[in-house]
Amino acid sequence: MRTTVILALALLVGLASANLLVNGDFEQTIDVGWDTVAVNFAGGDTFTWSDTLGQPSPGYAVAVRKYLADYASMSQTVGIPNVNLTLTLDGRLEIGGGSSTCWPVAAFVVRYLDSSGVSLGNTKLYLHDQYCDWAVSDTQSLIDVTTPGVWTQFSLDIADELAKSLPGVAAANVKKLTVDLYAYDNGT
């Protein structure tokens, strides 16, 4: 199985449109501002930084790939002034293969954290196969990506998402966000 997350992104604040992410445009190598981790029970992983990934806008993008179990992740945690933020990104998510014992997921995850860094909940924009058993809850929102392999512009209004989709997450307690490019496969 192969899972790929390819993204160019920005986390914007109000009218000023200031990017809160360090190297959010990926104009520098991915070791600037981003943490990468891979857990390999089987298969391998790759993290790619390039200006030739087919992205619709000029500049650089990154690809996170995971082959078989378990996951590869590229993330960044930032303090936020409030939840009146809009996350925008150009993304292309792809998965390959899949079965009831080995199902892949490609996701862009936003984790909502308190001031101590404790997770309060998350939103996942994700591409998955029919065996994926992730479920919506009062602290987890799942947004299906319906354009596999196609560059798509996504936008997530953080305040609106918390109010409408995450009743178990108090917006006033959200002091940090983690953005995570997440490639996952549950089996071998």
Roles of regions detected by a PLM:
Residues 2-8:
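Sec-dependent signal peptide recognition
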Residues 61-81, 134-137:
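Secreted extracellular polysaccharide-interacting domains
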Residues 26, 72-118, 154-160, 179:
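Extra-cytoplasmic beta-strand recognition segments
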Residues 13-15:
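N-terminal signal peptide c-region/cleavage motif recognized by signal peptidases
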Residues 19-65:
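Extracellular glycan-recognition surfaces and repeat-rich motifs
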Residues 148, 168-173, 182-188:
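Extracellular carbohydrate recognition
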Residues 120-170:
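Extracellular carbohydrate recognition and processing domains
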